[in-house]
C-alpha cells in the first residue's frame, strides 16, 4: 500500500510563481496579469510567461481556502492487477496521476492499493485497513463478485462514498459506476465481424479461465450472441473456456487451425485479452482471419498496423479513472452530488488507419 499526495508528488518538478519570476526575469505582477487575462501585457511577454508556466508545471491553486485551512480530501483506490490484462493497472494509474496533478494543490490525497486478481481477499483487507485510517471515499475495481458484495455491504452501512470503476454491481445500484456498457460492446463486436465477414462463416471465441464467471465478460458475450442471431450467415462455435495462460491460448488456436475445413474458424472474437498471443499464432501460420478484440496495449500495436488484428473496441481507462476521482473530489470538496449514477464511457473503434490517434 502506498500514499500518493498531490502536493508532495510534484515538488521536484513544479516551481512557485516567485521562482518562475526569477527564472524568466519577469515580475510576479506581470505573471499575475497573464494568469488573469488582464490587458497591458505584450503578446511576446504573454507567450514567454505561458511557455514558462507549462515548462515548470505550474498549476493555479483554485481553492486557496482549503489550503489556508489545511483541508485534505482523501480517496482510497483499491484495484486489481491481472496477468491477462496487465495494461489495466497502468492505464488506471495514469488517470489517477492526472487527477492528482489537477486537484492535489486543492487538498486531494490518494491512498492506493492493488491486489492480485486471483487473490480477491486482499481487496477486502486493503479496504478494512483504509477504513481504520479514516478513509470514507473509495474507488473500487474488483475481481470477485462475492468479495465486492461483502465490501459494499460494509461501506454502505458506514455511509461511505463509492465509485465502481470498470465493473458494476447490479445488486447495489445506488453507487456510482464509471465504465463501459459491456452488453453493448459485445453487440458492437458482432457488428464489426458481420462487416468483416460478408460471406459468412464460423467464429471462434476463446475465453480465459479467470473470466469464466465474470459477469461483465459474460454480458459482453451475451451481447455478441444476441447481435449475431440477426445474421444467418454467421455461426458462433461453442465458446472455448478454461484457457489459463499464454501456452493454453496458443495451443488451442493452433489445434483449431489444423482441423478439417468444415470445422476451422473463419473469424475470431477474442475474450482472452491476449490479442498479442492470438496475432502471433496467425502470423506464424500465415493465416489471414478476421480478428476483433478489446483494448489497446503496446504489444499489439504492430499487429494492428499490419492488419493481423482487424479492429479493436477501445475504452479510455485512464479517462475513466480520472473521472472517478473527479466525481468524488467535487462531491467532498464542493458538495456537488450527481443524480446520474451510471457514467458510461464511449466505445471507440481502432483500425490500422486511425491507430496513430491513440
Q: Can you name each region flagged by the protein language model?
A:
Residues 60-122:
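Amphipathic helical "hinge" segments at domain boundaries
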Residues 87-104, 185-189, 215-235, 277-278, ...:
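Short, solvent-exposed amphipathic alpha-helices that sit
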Residues 100-119, 204, 225-247, 263-265:
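Short beta-strand elements in bilobed, periplasmic/extracellular small-molecule ligand-binding domains
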Residues 130, 136-156, 224, 235-301:
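Hydrophobic alpha-helical
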Residues 144-184, 297-309:
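Flexible loop/hinge segments that line or gate small-molecule binding clefts
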Residues 177-204, 249-251, 300, 315-333:
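Hydrophobic alpha-helical segments within soluble ligand-binding/sensing domains
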Residues 228, 316-358:
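Hinge/cleft segment of the Venus flytrap/periplasmic-binding protein
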Amino acid at each position: 500500500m502506498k500514499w500518493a499526495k498531490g502536493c508532495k508528488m510534484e515538488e521536484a518538478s513544479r516551481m512557485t510563481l516567485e521562482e518562475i519570476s526569477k527564472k524568466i526575469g519577469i515580475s510576479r505582477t506581470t505573471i499575475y496579469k497573464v494568469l488573469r487575462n488582464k490587458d497591458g501585457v505584450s503578446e511576446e511577454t504573454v507567450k514567454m510567461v505561458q511557455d514558462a508556466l507549462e515548462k515548470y508545471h505550474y498549476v493555479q491553486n483554485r481553492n486557496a481556502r482549503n489550503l489556508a485551512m489545511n483541508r485534505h480530501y482523501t480517496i482510497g483506490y483499491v484495484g486489481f492487477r491481472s496477468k491477462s490484462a496487465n495494461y489495466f493497472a497502468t492505464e488506471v494509474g495514469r488517470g489517477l496521476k492526472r487527477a492528482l496533478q489537477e486537484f492535489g494543490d486543492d487538498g486531494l490525497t490518494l491512498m492506493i492499493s492493488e491486489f492480485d486478481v486471483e487473490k480477491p481477499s486482499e481487496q477486502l483487507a486493503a479496504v478494512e485497513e483504509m477504513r481504520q485510517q479514516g478513509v470514507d471515499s473509495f474507488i473500487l475495481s474488483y475481481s470477485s463478485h462475492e468479495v465486492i458484495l461483502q465490501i459494499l455491504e460494509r461501506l454502505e452501512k458506514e455511509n461511505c462514498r463509492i465509485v465502481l470503476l470498470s465493473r458494476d454491481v447490479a445488486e447495489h445500484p445506488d453507487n456510482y459506476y464509471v465504465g463501459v456498457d459491456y452488453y453493448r460492446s459485445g453487440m458492437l463486436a458482432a457488428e464489426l465481424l458481420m462487416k468483416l465477414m460478408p460471406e459468412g462463416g464460423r467464429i471462434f471465441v476463446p475465453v480465459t479461465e479467470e473470466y469464466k464467471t465474470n459477469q461483465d465478460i459474460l454480458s459482453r458475450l451475451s451481447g455478441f450472441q444476441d447481435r449475431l442471431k440477426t445474421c444467418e450467415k454467421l455461426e458462433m462455435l461453442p465458446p472455448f473456456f478454461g484457457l489459463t495462460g499464454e501456452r493454453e491460448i496458443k495451443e488451442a488456436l493452433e489445434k483449431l487451425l489444423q482441423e478439417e475445413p468444415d470445422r476451422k474458424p473463419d473469424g475470431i472474437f477474442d475474450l482472452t485479452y491476449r490479442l498479442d498471443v492470438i496475432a502471433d499464432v496467425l502470423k506464424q501460420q500465415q493465416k489471414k482471419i478476421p480478428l476483433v478484440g478489446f483494448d489497446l496495449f503496446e504489444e499489439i500495436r504492430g499487429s494492428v498496423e499490419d492488419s493481423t488484428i482487424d479492429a479493436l473496441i477501445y475504452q479510455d481507462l485512464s479517462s475513466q479513472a480520472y473521472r472517478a476521482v473527479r466525481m468524488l473530489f467535487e462531491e467532498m470538496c464542493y458538495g456537488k452530488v450527481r443524480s446520474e449514477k451510471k457514467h458510461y464511457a464511449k466505445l471507440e473503434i481502432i483500425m490500422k488507419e486511425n491507430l496513430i490517434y491513440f
